[in-house]
Amino acid sequence: MITRLWNKFSETYWQYKFSGSNVRISNSDGFVIGKGSTIQNSNVFVGRDACFFIGAHCILKNVDIYIEKGCVIIDDYAILISEKPINKAMYIISNGNFHVNHHTKIQCDRVWIRFGGNVEIGSYTNINSGSEIRSDESVIIGSYNQISYDVNIWDTNTHTIYKSEKRSEITRKYFPYFGYEIEKPLTSPIVVGDNCWIGERSSIMKGTQIGDNVIVGYNTMLLNKIIESNKRVVQDINLRIL
């Protein structure tokens, strides 16, 4: 009787934890979910060479998380969510690490980490939908930041430029995976300080370092730029009327 009651309790407990979700763990020691945390309408895969540690009172909702190699740590009261239940947010950790500090809300469409990349996001930071983080080296985002919609943060060229013969050879070998990368592209780390506001449709590209209390205006692109603290950055647009 006690065994049956315990099994029923466990079944109900995990159904609540993983409401409408598929969770596949290849490494039993590599997955921990804290008190009061839930995974809703999501898909999670943790490979043999990976780990996924979720703190207390976290919410993961409408997300697909695939961790092939590396570690993902979600601290207490953090939220990973998409407002689009059908088109879920994608978190792909092919090889690298991803750390979200406490009381942070991420609504990115995609986070993609490869080639041993590292992404760390501080506390009380919000990233809105449509945004994307790609790391093949290092992206460090501080605390109390507001990152708007459709913002791209890439520390990588994402692709290596080959001669046409080499790219054709790779395409044939790895078909149907077009654009397959066999070596790490050019990269340079990104740092965003604390209390920054990154405007809608901005692009923070490789090699950019942003200090504290910086505002980046709408549709601004930063590549290999150093922005000192307490600055305002806008894209220079020259309007011509012909």
Question: Where in the sequence are the language-model features?
Answer:
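Domain-scale signature associated with acetyltransferase and cell-envelope carbohydrate enzymes
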Residues: 1-155, 160-161, 169-178, 182-213, ...
